[in-house]
């Protein structure tokens, strides 16, 4: 049986890969290799298709429940963002170093949309990152947590669709790439978001998953 490069990568025998940089990735979009808005993320220098599917569905499928929860989060957070002097971005990249440009489902960033007319937000701009996960749950708990914790994002929310729970990660540790505190919120509970500039917002988990 023939051996592919992927087999060699998993076995640790492949030659070194050359990572794609954020600048190169953005140039690909400008050159029309990818369309702006395509569900492609740059993770550790590799191009990765963003998984918005339900478990058992094809990766290209956009799970309707995933889309619904993103819309609800947008509605819940919009007014609080304006009061906090923040800007809400939906499924738009952020830049975390030279080889990472993930596309969170929801990102709360400091400032206004005009502040990002010529650039994507970086680590110093980020208040809250949110991923809505079904089949991508494992990746969002591991890879995405590592990226966001390393970047020092104060809070990371993982919307767990299969179990109708909201996982809240706080106290990022850049050295370990993990958050020191994790709490799980279910129906009947509320989640507090404490932006650094204003009063907190209490989000009902029941309303989110109804």
Language-model features: where?
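Gly/Pro/Ser/Thr-rich low-complexity, intrinsically disordered segments predominantly at protein N-termini
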Residues: 1-210
């Amino acid at each position: 049986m023939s051996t592919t490069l992927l087999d060699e990568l998993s076995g640790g025998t492949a030659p070194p890969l050359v990572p794609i940089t954020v600048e190169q990735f953005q140039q690909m979009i400008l050159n029309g290799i990818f369309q702006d808005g395509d569900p492609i993320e740059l993770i550790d220098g590799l191009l990765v298709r963003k998984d918005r599917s339900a478990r058992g569905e094809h990766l290209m499928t956009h799970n309707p429940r995933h889309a619904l929860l993103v819309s609800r989060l947008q509605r819940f957070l919009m007014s609080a963002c304006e009061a906090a002097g923040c800007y809400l971005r939906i499924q738009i990249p952020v830049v975390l170093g030279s080889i990472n440009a993930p596309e969170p489902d929801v990102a709360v960033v400091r400032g206004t949309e005009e502040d990002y007319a010529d650039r994507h937000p970086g680590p110093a701009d980020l208040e809250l990152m949110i991923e809505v996960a079904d089949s991508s749950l494992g990746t969002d708990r591991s890879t995405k947590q590592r990226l966001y914790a390393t970047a020092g994002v104060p809070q990371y929310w993982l919307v767990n669709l299969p179990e109708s729970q909201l996982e809240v990660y706080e106290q990022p540790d850049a050295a370990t790439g993990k958050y020191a505190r994790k709490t799980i919120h279910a129906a009947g509970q509320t989640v507090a978001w404490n932006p650094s500039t204003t009063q907190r917002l209490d989000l009902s988990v029941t309303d989110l998953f109804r």
